[in-house]
């Protein structure tokens, strides 16, 4: 698997979820399964089957998160030069087709939240912008077709990951 770029915030968030799953959720589901097992015939025991399904989900999530942590590439965007678009850059772009301005910050996939302007490093928009400079024109493939943009500004600002 390729390295997964992320900020320290994203890394800590994944590690906290992994710890919660291993230390709290996993032991709790084992108890739930034991209790359900005590309710008789396992073939017709909906509580048992639901608990086993939940256990499969928890174990799969642990595997996924463990892989992400193992492949994490923690990047401090505050120390990068943002003269070209890179991880952690905030980019102001102008859609040349409709004169609308957009602002995006490039973050790791585990941190992305497009509604808040936080786009994944691996997203089509970010891939089109990475390495470009202020003033560059860029064609970006969007769901409704290709659009042309101009990069108006590239800068670093502290990324707001508010969890609300």
UniProtKB/Swiss-Prot annotation:
Keywords for the protein's UniProt record, in alphabetical order: DNA-binding, Transcription, Transcription regulation
Highest rank taxon of the organism: Bacteria
GO biological process: DNA-templated transcription elongation; regulation of DNA-templated transcription elongation
Keyword Transcription regulation found: yes
Key word Transcription regulation present: yes
Protein family: Belongs to the GreA/GreB family.
Function summary: Necessary for efficient RNA polymerase transcription elongation past template-encoded arresting sites. The arresting sites in DNA have the property of trapping a certain fraction of elongating RNA polymerases that pass through, resulting in locked ternary complexes. Cleavage of the nascent transcript by cleavage factors such as GreA or GreB allows the resumption of elongation from the new 3'terminus. GreA releases sequences of 2 to 3 nucleotides.
Protein name from the UniProt record: Transcription elongation factor GreA
Lineage of the organism: Bacteria, Pseudomonadati, Campylobacterota, Epsilonproteobacteria, Campylobacterales
């Amino acid at each position: 698997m390729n390295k997964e770029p992320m900020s320290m915030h994203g890394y800590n968030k994944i590690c906290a979820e992994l710890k919660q799953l291993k230390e709290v959720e996993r032991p709790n589901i084992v108890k739930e399964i034991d209790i359900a097992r005590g309710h008789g015939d396992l073939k017709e025991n909906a509580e048992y089957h639901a608990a086993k399904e939940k256990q499969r989900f928890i174990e799969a999530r642990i595997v996924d998160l463990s892989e992400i942590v193992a492949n994490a590439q923690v990047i401090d965007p505050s120390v990068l030069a943002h003269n070209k678009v890179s991880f952690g850059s905030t980019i102001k772009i102008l859609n040349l087709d409709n004169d609308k301005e957009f602002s995006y910050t490039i973050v790791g996939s585990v941190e992305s939240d497009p509604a808040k302007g936080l786009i994944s490093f691996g997203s089509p928009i970010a891939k089109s912008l990475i390495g470009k400079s202020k003033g560059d024109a860029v064609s970006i493939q969007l769901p409704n077709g290709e659009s042309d943009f101009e990069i108006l500004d590239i800068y670093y600002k502290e990324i707001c990951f508010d969890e609300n």
